[in-house]
Amino acid sequence: MPINIPDGLPAKRILQQERIFALEEDVARKQQIRPLRVALLNLMPTKIETETQILRLISKSPIQVSVDFMRVSSHEATHAADHLVKFYDTFDDLRSNNYDGLIITGAPVEQMPFESVDYWDELCRIMDWAQEHVLSTMFLCWGAFAGLYHLHGIHKRLLGSKLFGVFPQRLCDEYNFLTNGFDEVHNMPHSRHAAPDEKEIDADPALQVLSRGETSGPALIATRDFHEIYALGHFEYGRDTLADEYWRDFHAGLPIQLPLNYFPDDDPEKQPIFTWRSHANLLYRNWLNYVYQTTPYDLERVPEVVAELREHTEQLLAKGGVPSKF
């Protein structure tokens, strides 16, 4: 998927070196189709690495995607501050827009109570805004915990030890639109200190668990209309991301275990095997395909379509069914 991102963005040069289409802005303006409009709320301190990983995944289908980069204004960044000023807009700058998609990343704050995070109130306003102005939002890792808690009252619990490694996940419904093409068992990287309350998830009729693992628990969760998608792991991670996290903590003298099912022979000097790449690409391709098939041509109609999908889903759930088109 050709992506339309600002000229000069560091990720653009990296992606072009990988033979991924990143359109020049003047070329994108001349294409006679409406690009999907996606916003990326990047809460990670590693801004450039995270945006590159996500842009790499949303570039894998033949529809142009225009990406706006969003930041919170209630948190003072200590990493890549100049990069944020140059390429990122605040929520207040973007809130008058409608979007086909929104991606909310994780953040290294999962051991804190939600309300203790300094930008929590602003994040809640963004999630509330997205309920009307975004066709589909994908929440990643801590972003998923935040969305499940704020929008569905799903609590998190802290784990006795960090869930760290690559873990097998089993599909709960092989015919689900979002996991179309997935193997019945597939791998997903995880790097987190918390887990969601599974009983609360299973008790919420608006939510469906798409995949889960014996060790990791629920990995992919979505609302019935795919307005919200929650990925508890890190499909966006590159081959070496877990290794980088391991060596970072190791050299800092922090307690850290080897990531499970990752290094060959559990030898951190060996190159990890990239076992989740195809399913990561499938997830984002399926998500963008859903958005493309569902979104109105006129972005001004996004709130109307979101309301129609929600009403349709609620009516079917009240009758004990699920939306047949999904």
Regions found by a protein language model. Give the residues of each.
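Short, glycine/charged-enriched secondary-structure capping and boundary segments
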Residues: 53-55, 84, 116-119, 152-155, ...
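N-terminal beta-loop-helix "entrance" segment that forms/cooperates
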Residues: 73-86
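Cysteine-nucleophile active-site neighborhood
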Residues: 104-173
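Amide-donor transfer/coupling interface in amidating biosynthetic enzymes
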Residues: 1-71, 88-94, 98, 166-326
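Short glycine/proline-rich turn/loop motifs
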Residues: 85, 105-108, 267-268
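Short glycine-/acidic-enriched loop or helix-start segments at secondary-structure transitions
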Residues: 50, 79, 113-114, 148-150, ...
